[in-house]
Amino acid sequence: MKKNTHPEYRQVLFVDSSTGYKFICGSTYQTDKTEVFEGQEYPVCYVSVSSSSHPFFTGSKKLVDAEGRVDKFLKRYSGIKQSAPKPETVVEDVLPKGKRKSPAKKKK
């Protein structure tokens, strides 16, 4: 087997940036940042959503939006008025009554 082909597998500290929740998990994530957790120093990875903040796991319907995407959307489209529904127009036959085509018959 070739040496140095796979990244190093190690314990990494993951930090949920929206709740501050920290947990350790094995990973090949590469970083220079480290943080002390429970008396040991670990490489750290900051995540925006984890099981402590995701609505599926928390059971809440609260939307956590760190980047402000919802606010940006609301600001952009809040001034737009909905257009009134267009009234239906009556379509009249163009061909005179005697010149109308009969519907095509299906062949058996």
Swiss-Prot record:
SUPFAM superfamilies: L28p-like (SSF143800)
Origin species: Chlamydia trachomatis serovar A (strain ATCC VR-571B / DSM 19440 / HAR-13)
Similarity remark: Belongs to the bacterial ribosomal protein bL31 family. Type B subfamily.
One annotated Gene Ontology cellular component of this protein: ribonucleoprotein complex
Record Pfam families: Ribosomal_L31
GO biological process, one term: translation
Positions of region (Disordered): 86-108
Sequence ranges of Basic residues compositional bias: 97-108
Highest taxon in the source lineage: Bacteria
Ribosomal protein listed as a keyword: yes
Signal peptide (UniProt feature, chain positions): none
Molecular-function GO terms, alphabetical: structural constituent of ribosome
Keywords in alphabetical order: Ribonucleoprotein, Ribosomal protein
Name this protein carries in UniProt: Large ribosomal subunit protein bL31B
Subunit annotation: Part of the 50S ribosomal subunit.
Keyword Ribosomal protein part of the UniProt annotation: yes
